[in-house]
Design a protein with these regions (language model features):
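N-terminal, active-site-proximal structural segment of metallo-dependent hydrolase catalytic domains
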Residues: 200-361
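Extended non-catalytic accessory segments flanking core domains
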Residues: 1-262, 280-281, 369, 377-390
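Sec-exported extracytoplasmic/periplasmic mature domains
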Residues: 28-37, 46-51, 83, 87, ...
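Extracytoplasmic mature domains of secreted/periplasmic and thylakoid-lumen proteins
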Residues: 339-390
Length: 390
């Protein structure tokens, strides 16, 4: 790619750069190497020079769409031009990174467009994969810090980059670059790095602003009714805790202080003990009751017939619905008796050996909607069969 960017090179050095600041003019001796796709200079010495030189200017370029173009700008200071949209916030709370699409729309899972190898939809599937490859880039925080790692005691005191209570970052938001960034390659992905690590104490170093595209009240055409639908992942809501099944504390996800919080490699998933179960349930109940929805599709709720959970003899419903019933009871305790009901499982269900310990489910408000007929569990379609790879 043709550009006028000042040449840049990543310098790896853990000893000699602590006293340097942005703008210093230095002489670096070392050895060039390729480290997992990033060209870097492994410094043996760094000398600060007294000469006065002009600071490098950022190159104003559109996002390079090919690896060849990106390589020509690797480690260089650029001022990104064109449209950028938030497309992924999955690892923002862990690594302080935000996935961007270099276009005016976020990416879709390619299987939304089609199925790999399918005669009719395979081309659409591949087209979305190609778009992700051409337009995908991460906005990083200038650090490799894992905010969930307990070996960093200052994690609890370091605010997550880019986020604040009054400025959430949502998929679909427009991204505007206000400061230059460095085009970087690490962890198998191209990234925009700020010129210094974002710590919460240097908010002015944040190189972007976000513009929300969400309206407070969506504009809806006049319809004959007003039913609100929502979906909510309860993230392994189980009716039995890990400590009740005798799971070892070595098989637990822990908080920053090393206390067990959720199950890992246990006979159940979800909360570690009663206190964490109540904390999980309280968050779910508050969130769902504040959705304003009339029908909610739930994901990752316990299949009580399959999981190693205790279903009391007093429960008169289908065994697989027990955890679901406890969540509905908790919702009604806060919202009022009878506010919520769940759609019961059908009498005919798949064999337990082909079911998972988690499932999907529907809850609804009887005052707004009613069920018609018996439910069905769809198992005869490739689209619902994970063993087929989609």
């Amino acid at each position: 790619a043709e550009h006028k960017a000042a040449d840049g090179l990543f310098v790896y050095d853990s000893k000699n750069v602590k006293d340097l600041q942005i703008g210093d003019y230095v002489k670096v001796n070392g050895t060039i190497s390729e480290y997992y796709g990033l060209t870097e200079l492994n410094a043996s010495s760094v000398t600060k020079l007294s000469d006065k030189v002009e600071a490098p200017k950022a190159s104003t370029v559109a996002f390079p769409k090919t690896d060849t173009e990106r390589e020509s700008l690797e480690s260089m200071l650029i001022a990104p031009q064109g449209d950028y949209t938030v497309s992924d916030v999955y690892n923002t709370n862990k690594y302080g990174e935000i996935g961007l699409a270099a276009s005016n729309k976020p990416f879709l899972n390619p299987t939304v467009k089609g199925l790999k190898g399918d005669a009719e939809t395979g081309a659409a599937y591949q087209a979305e994969l190609d778009r992700i490859e051409a337009e995908g880039v991460y906005l990083d925080d200038g650090s490799s810090r894992n905010f969930l790692d307990t070996k960093y005691p200052d994690n609890a005191d370091t605010p997550l980059p880019y986020l604040s209570n009054d400025q959430p970052v949502r998929v679909g938001e427009k991204v505007t670059f206000t400061k230059p960034v460095v085009l970087d390659y690490r962890n198998s992905a191209w990234r925009f790095q700020p010129t210094e690590r974002l710590t919460g104490d240097n908010a002015d170093a944040q190189p972007v602003t976000f513009t929300s595209t969400r309206t407070d009240t969506p504009d809806l055409a006049a319809v004959g009714g007003d039913i609100r639908l929502a979906t909510f992942n309860v993230l392994n809501y189980f009716s039995t805790t890990a400590d009740e099944t005798g799971c070892s504390t070595s098989n637990a996800y822990t908080d920053r202080d090393g206390n067990p919080v959720t199950a890992k490699n246990c006979d159940v998933r979800g909360a570690w003990d009663k206190a964490n179960m109540e904390r999980q349930r309280a968050k779910i109940v508050k969130a769902i009751n504040n959705l304003g929805a009339d029908v909610v599709s739930l994901e990752e709720i316990e299949n009580s017939a399959k999981a190693a959970s205790s279903v009391p003899a007093s429960f008169k419903g289908e065994r697989r619905d027990y955890a679901l019933s406890t969540l509905v009871d908790a919702l009604n305790e806060q919202a009022g008796e009878g506010t919520w009901a769940y759609v019961p499982s059908p009498q005919t269900v798949p064999d337990l050996d082909v079911e998972d310990v988690i499932r999907t489910a529907f809850i609804y408000k009887p005052a707004k909607v009613a069920t018609v007929g018996e439910t069905r569990i769809l198992t005869d379609s490739d689209a619902f069969n994970g063993k087929n790879g989609y």
